[in-house]
A protein has these predicted regions:
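A preference for well-ordered globular domain cores
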Residues: 2-151
Length: 151
């Protein structure tokens, strides 16, 4: 499959493809953007990087679960978790217990952290998850090979 293809020379329409996942039956699933000009290497990189960033953001926001409950990691929630953790550490747990809402609006799960060890377990797993998602995204962006886009 061509990653860069002119699909209409008269209208100067080009398609850029990335994240190609080939299946056993020979077909493939991929992302694609159609442009009204032949993109430069930097445009291709920017397009693909932006998509990888969006995928990482979505995974961070809604891909983490703790004790089998989904945890919504919005920027605000990340800040609240960090603030609660930092305060608990600084006061040697005197600010505990602290309760967070996990799950969904339809099926909320309220989790109360009674001990510093308990809260530390949650917070370190949250941070590790975010770091793992970011690291995977960086690897994908670093692996963009513009030589595969030569038309």
């Amino acid at each position: 499959m061509k990653l860069l293809e002119c699909v209409n020379p008269v209208k100067n329409k080009w398609r850029v493809r990335w994240d190609v996942q080939e299946r056993d039956d020979g077909s493939a699933e991929y992302m694609e953007a159609e442009l009204t000009h032949k993109p430069s290497g930097e445009e291709i990189k920017s397009l693909v990087r932006t998509w990888y960033n969006e995928q990482a953001d979505a995974a961070i926001l809604s891909g983490f679960s703790y004790e089998n409950a989904p945890v919504w990691l919005s920027q605000e929630n990340q800040y609240n978790y960090k603030a609660a953790y930092d305060l608990a550490v600084q006061t040697d747990g005197k600010t505990l217990p602290v309760t967070f809402k996990f799950g969904t609006d339809e099926e909320p799960v309220y989790r109360t952290f009674e001990t510093l060890d308990d809260l530390t377990d949650f917070y370190t797993k949250t941070v590790k998850y975010i770091q793992d998602v970011l690291t995977a995204g960086w690897k994908k962006k670093d692996a963009i090979d513009l030589s595969k886009y030569e038309a």
